[in-house]
Amino acid sequence: MLFEDRQKNRSTGPTLIGFNQTQNEHENTVCPTHPESSDRILKIKEALTKTKILEKCTVLTNFLEIDDADLEVTHDKSMVKDLMESEKKTQEDINSQCEKYDSVFMTENSMKVAKDGVACVRDLTNRIMANEASNGFAVVRPPGHHADSVSPCGFCLFNNVAQAAEEAFFSGAERILIVDLDVHHGHGTQRIFYDDKRVLYFSIHRHEHGLFWPHLPESDFDHIGSGKGLGYNANLALNETGCTDSDYLSIIFHVLLPLATQFDPHFVIISAGFDALLGDPLGGMCLTPDGYSHILYHLKSLAQGRMLVVLEGGYNHQISAVAVQRCVRVLLGYAPFSIELNEAPKESTVDSCVSLVSVLRHHWNCFDYFPSRTSLRLAQWPIVNTKVIYNYDPTTRRADTGEIIQDELASTEFTASDVIPTENMETLIYFNEGDDAHFDLEEDNHPEKPARTRRILKTLRESGVLEKCVDRNCERIATNEEIRLVHTKKMLEHLRTTETMKDEELMEEAEKEFNSIYLTRDTLKVARKAVGAVLQSVDEIFEKDAGQRNALVIVRPPGHHASASKSSGFCIFNNVAVAAKYAQRRHKAKRVLILDWDVHHGNGTQEIFYEDSNVMYMSIHRHDKGNFYPIGEPKDYSDVGEGAGEGMSVNVPFSGVQMGDNEYQMAFQRVIMPIAYQFNPDLVLISAGFDAAVDDPLGEYKVTPETFALMTYQLSSLAGGRIITVLEGGYNLTSISNSAQAVCEVLQNRSMLRRLREEKEQFATKPQKIESSCIKTIREVCAVQQKYWSILKGFQVTPSNYGLDIDDEAYDDDSIDMADQSSSSGSSSSSTRPSHNLEIMDSGPAHAVVPLATCPHLKEVKPLPPAKINARTACSECQIGAEVWTCLTCYKYNCGRFVNEHAMMHHLSSSHPMALSMADLSVWCYPCDSYVHNPALIGAKSAAHESKFGETMPS
């Protein structure tokens, strides 16, 4: 079957666990207590067995043998030959051979062990790519990510993940994402794929400006690939120890997920080093085992869940085993355990993030959220310094790892909650077959009609999704006491009077007393049953351990416009609000998150909890500057709650153009998920209106079923997987049923099996476009919400950060589609920059632009060419004459960042550091991220001045 067909027919399968059985034959004979030992694997096996996870997996130990030709796909023939010769040597000679390498040990059997490890990862990859399995974990050693094409290094002999990538290519994958979580940079993997755009390599590692092993300049953020692979290498280099779950998840949401989503891989490989764990003797970081599992969970949303996790480092054997256990749980479909993010990401982490973004944003427009780093009127990052600093002295003797006594390290114990339940996970579907008794007496084709729920159920049944779930025609009728958890006695009594009215009276009552409501004599009963179904789902979700059950409640009438005292907007009772209060009262849920993605703001829900510190209401909705229903309600980004509830209302109010998948996904990555993680709910309720879907007649947005599914998947990472999705609006029967099916599939599969976009829409042929008004809105939301949620701090860019008076239009447009505006801008852009520089310089010393007097890159300035400098020439790439710069190494002319950014692209591809502006004769150093003025530059400046003005430059 072709890979394209396997993509269309993706389904769930087993999780594979692979062990190389011979791994205990590879030990350090010089240092018996060396941390990279067979005990690592034994502890992992014990953990997986003790918690009964291994029983849920398909365990593989025998693999098709590989030969030297397989190894030579990623390693030079001479390297393979040298290593293979160890099989014929004495241990003494082997030890002498190892001294040629950095931190390598071997025995006469090490080649057999290493080849078994490679065979394991290749076998698992082949099975996953063939749809024989959902995902897999290769529990193998020795690790591999430090081994490059010419040499073993850092405990690594052959590069396992590189071998897995080649197997995936052979099996049909065209794009592979490798995420390296080891605390040490996987420079071997980076080198192998550095000029290969088929592989996006993303590493999060400790660097400390080169002080941490492997002490390489290439481990820093400015190394982003070369040749065709330019922009496909990403180093998130951490320059401080003690980074926590907050730091790592900030990286995931702000940098990795946006980038990986745009890359859209066919296969994901995790270089799973567990030495960033709190308690690791070598790492110095504070990531928790559950933090690891959350990272894995979100990466599993890519590539239709095709993921291979490959063991790398991790030298506290017991804690590493716990982390592996947590990760395999996630691979099996269980939601990760909840984590608390009580602190802001470190300033140095934010610095590392935006430094990386600064060099990648020219290649990936998913980073349009961030303004151009070297544009002075947009350079408002409060704590960022993107200078490349390299502190390591290569003459310093590298300390040996030495022995590590495992019994002296920190440890943790498994609890009963770690043991996998014997029963399978369930998805519960609730509906009310009698909801057709609530209909519009006057208008047969009212958008909120009984056909909505019937069509959804029909689609679920015909697609085969319903039979995989536990479906319930729920007859539970919510009691007065339950309804009054939210609604007033007066409101309930008023609705009870409608049960005896005649049709004419009902129509008159609806028009006179309500806003956008119709009534029948059975409306109250149907509405009670809608509430009852949601409450029943709460009870059954809390009957089991977190994550064992989730639910989709397909009921009407909807609820999120109903306030405590008034039915409104097709809504009688606020189903979700009653459920939130009920969960708190009955099941002691301390914190409840309500996420409302209905295109209309859930004004009723927000009002009910506006002063409540224990219920968070988050809404992504169409706002149109207040002119979209519900008009006149507090639903802007500045409406954040009051009193004890201040900061507990989060509104993402889109205005202007039609929003779609990219905008909703950005809102989730930048706003929803970071805040929701820090809130850390015990229950997640989704007000699932599907009127933002493609072709909805009221919403007029263009969100696809796949994005509704993705949002559901991401929210399922919270509350241990206790999530209930409740139908709200949605008025195109095809759109609503397709969207509900996609959501139900995610709930049932616990995985994203759908592709996020069609092949013809891939980034390579159609770069994703983020609407500028969306970016403006999200910036505004974050600027307000960072006051309440520390996980957002440092990432927000607003004029107020520096007190600069910048108009919104200029602020937005310069960070998005700069190439589009430049072609018609003439020379205006070249004059804007110097004048604005002067304005900033005049504003006082706090904002003065002071060029560096010297920099280490002046040595790269070459003598003038025979033709000297032509200040009136155009860009050599696009032939546009606006804002032209000349490289001071090769004297090539290229346009600046307000045109098509060819000067920056030239720097990134050639590493030529300095350029001279033909507009204002300033010199910019890219690596130093600063202007430079030095006598060594006078010759070039004088030549440009003479060409530009026809006279000698004044001294």
From Swiss-Prot:
> InterPro entries, per this entry?
HDAC_PDAC, His_deacetylse, His_deacetylse_dom, His_deacetylse_dom_sf, Ureohydrolase_dom_sf, Znf_RING/FYVE/PHD, Znf_UBP
The record's Gene Ontology cellular component field reads:
histone deacetylase complex
Q: Where is the composition biased (Low complexity)?
A: 818-831
Q: Give the region (Histone deacetylase 1) as residue ranges.
A: 15-337
Q: Which residues bind Zn(2+) 1?
A: 855, 857, 925, 928
> Is Kinase among this UniProt entry's keywords?
no
Q: Where does Zn(2+) 2 bind?
A: 875, 878, 895, 902
Task: List the cofactors.
Answer: Zn(2+)
The answer to whether UniProt assigns keyword Glycoprotein to this entry is no
Instruction: Name the family.
Output: Belongs to the histone deacetylase family. HD type 2 subfamily.
Q: What is this protein called?
A: Histone deacetylase 6
